[in-house]
A protein has these predicted regions:
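Amphipathic alpha-helical segments of tetratricopeptide repeats
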Residues: 97-118, 153-166, 207-222, 255-267, ...
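DNA major-groove recognition helix of helix-turn-helix/homeodomain DNA-binding modules
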Residues: 47-62, 380-398, 643
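Structural motif corresponding to the intra-repeat A-B loop/turn of tetratricopeptide repeats
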Residues: 87, 142, 197-200, 245, ...
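A short, Lys/Arg-rich alpha-helix, primarily the initiator
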Residues: 1-18, 320-351
Length: 647
């Protein structure tokens, strides 16, 4: 019997985006089902299917269509629907929702079809929740606000916790809500507010519900990334209600907390709206002088957005209201799969695959994997062997992607990366020691996972040693190549055909950095372009991959400038800024503007460079950015130069 069909296919979501257990399961099951099956340390006994298949040279929908065409059709429909919502494309959205196939949600009479009894392999409640939410957005875009509110309430109720409920014990009740369910509640509350602008009793009720969610999400030990993602939306709506009810003072604390979270954890999608709201709060209370810092931050962020619009012609989220921004946040990226019992149907006997039910260990071990038996079908019909052949994996050799074997290890890895990003080298080194001990304690399952964990630790120690100037650039280059060689042959001419994990892309970027430091700019460009070409050709939308693309964009912008190729440099500056802001981040925008300013100074466009440096100096105050001191020095030097030339 062959084991672990999942190989490089299923596990990526765990590691690549540092997904906490409740994030991983969001979109697969309800929170109550998660608690039933998976309470504990990363005790996932069913894994998502949409993050998987790059190593096969096909995207996930290709693979799903091969395994279960019904699922492929649904996911294709859902992705088109979400795209239409984000683009406010009501013509396409109506066509998708009123289609006469099994994926249309609205029947010929204009009513929501009850499709819980169907042949889908996925959780029907989650499918219906998404579909009805989409119908509510169509109603909203076409101006039927009351109908939009009615439909979104119905969507909320598909997973059992409606926003009209009064929670006697909110800790007990609301802990069952996943991120997506919370977002659905917020959307419903937003429509409730819009439909009851003159109804104080309704506003009181909605405000109370939002207050419960605020206390729950920020005071329940929830993963900080979940808090950062959702708190600004809940807070904004809650504060808006308090202002409408004449209790502006009750909005000060959540509004300040929201701004603090976004600045600390690099989230920009709600930043401008929240800063405006805080300024309005202070004006309503007659103490606008206390909002001077927020006014300065707002002006700085508007300068960044104005700069991007001047360069590229448009700005992400421009003219988007609250609902549209909520629907662009990362919560909705969760995939629409199924409970642990149902997902096995995706692997039903098609092309020779048969299934064994996932074994659930008594202690919910992460070593539980999908067990797939080879069938007695003809070899060319054997799907498992087909995958192995396409991957080039010899029989008996397992090459699963890394995932941490305990929640503690997962958190340590996240803390290490943050410490290194903040140049807290001693702290990172100490955390690496703890991670090594935790991996030994928890066990990683097999030799390959041990190798990949070893690669992460080796790369981290190499970076720390180089940052601390304990090794030379040439020594660091040699160590990087040896570290990468544990899993990837970088000299392979077909490297663009190989699947590269996020960690491997990061090591490639480290190699590019060293070549740059050694003065070999052409080699630096070559390695940075490996990362860009890989991600762009696959249209990868994972935030972890986007982060690596941003590093590569900035590297290429700087390198092409060094090679006096200013047009190419400008192109990567525009791409980098747009990607950073459209992904909901924003911190690196100042870095790209700094690169632009430096280029303009090189071209003797001194006034343009001076203005850009001023934008950088102001913008660095928002999220914090290491370019501020350099920008101040360059601004002062350039200003003195301009003044001396004038005299």
């Amino acid at each position: 019997m062959e084991e672990e069909l999942v190989l490089r296919i299923i596990n990526e979501k765990l590691e690549y985006e540092h997904i906490a257990p409740e994030w991983l399961c969001d979109g697969i099951c309800t929170r109550s089902e998660y608690d039933k099956y998976c309470t504990g340390e990363m005790d996932i006994d069913y894994l998502t299917l949409e993050m998987m298949l790059e190593r096969l040279g096909m995207n996930s929908l290709d693979f799903i269509s091969w395994v279960d065409y019904d699922v492929y059709e649904y996911l294709e429909w859902r992705d088109k629907t979400m795209e239409a919502i984000r683009n406010k494309d009501t013509v396409t959205l109506r066509r998708l929702l009123y289609s006469d196939d099994m994926y249309g949600i609205v029947d010929v009479n204009g009513e929501i079809s009850d499709r819980e009894e169907n042949r889908w392999s996925m959780n029907p409640k989650l499918i219906m929740q998404f579909g009805v939410m989409a119908v509510s957005m169509l109603e909203w875009f076409e101006g039927r606000k009351a109908e939009a509110g009615r439909y979104v309430k119905q969507a909320v109720e598909y997973t059992g916790l409606g926003n009209s409920m009064e929670f006697e014990d909110e800790d007990t009740s609301m802990k069952m809500l996943s991120d997506k369910e919370i977002a659905m509640n917020v959307l419903s509350d937003y429509f409730e507010v819009e439909n009851n602008l003159e109804n104080n009793a309704a506003l009181e009720r909605t405000g109370r519900h939002l207050g419960q969610m605020l206390r729950y999400i920020d005071g329940n030990g929830r993963d900080i990334r979940s808090v950062v993602l959702l708190f600004p939306y809940i807070s904004y709506l809650y504060v808006r209600i308090q202002i409408m009810l004449g209790r502006a003072e009750q909005g000060i604390s959540p509004c300040k907390r929201s701004i603090e979270l976004m600045r600390t954890h690099n989230q920009c999608r709600m930043l401008e709206m929240t800063l405006r709201q805080y300024i309005q709060l202070m004006e309503n209370l007659g103490i606008s002088n206390r909002a001077q810092d927020e006014e300065r931050l707002l002006k700085s962020w508007q300068e960044v957005l104005g700069f991007l619009k001047r360069l590229s012609g448009n700005v992400p989220d421009e003219d988007c209201g609250f609902a549209e921004r909520l629907l662009r946040c990362g919560v909705w990226n969760g995939r629409a799969f199924v409970t642990e019992g149902d997902i096995i149907k995706l692997y039903r006997a098609r092309e020779g695959i048969t299934q064994k039910r996932l074994s659930i260990d008594a202690d919910y071990s992460m070593r539980s994997m999908w067990l797939i038996e080879n069938s007695k079908a003809k070899p060319q019909k054997n799907g498992y062997e087909k995958i192995r052949k396409r991957l080039g994996i010899p029989s008996g050799h397992i090459h699963s992607d890394i995932y941490c074997t305990s929640y503690k290890a997962y958190m340590l890895k996240y803390q290490i990366e943050r410490a290194m990003m903040n140049w807290e080298l001693e702290k990172a080194d100490g955390l690496l020691d703890k991670l090594e001990k935790e991996l030994i304690r928890a066990g990683s399952g097999d030799e390959v996972k041990n190798l990949i964990n070893k690669q992460f630790i080796m790369d981290s120690r190499n970076v720390i040693a180089y940052m601390a100037k304990k090794i030379t650039a040439k020594e660091y280059l040699d160590k990087c190549k040896k570290c990468l060689a544990l899993t990837v042959d970088i000299e392979n001419k077909k490297i663009d055909k190989v699947f590269l994990r996020v960690e491997e892309l990061l090591i490639i970027l480290h190699i590019a950095q060293v070549y740059r430091n050694l003065g070999n700019t052409e080699k630096a460009v070559k390695y940075s372009k490996i990362v860009i070409d890989y991600c762009e050709s696959r249209n990868i939308k994972s935030q972890a991959y986007i982060n690596k693309m941003l590093i590569a964009y900035h590297s290429l912008a700087s390198d092409y400038r060094s090679l006096n190729k200013y047009d190419e440099s400008l192109e990567y500056i525009k791409k980098g800024m747009f990607l950073d802001i459209s992904s909901g981040k924003g911190k690196l925008a100042a870095t790209f503007i700094f690169c632009y300013a430096y280029s303009q100074a090189k071209l003797n466009n001194n006034l343009e460079a001076l203005n850009a440096y001023q934008i950088v100096i102001n913008a660095c105050e928002i999220f914090g950015n290491s370019n501020r001191d350099k920008a101040v020095r360059n601004y002062t030097r350039l200003k003195n130069k301009i003044e001396s030339e004038d005299t």
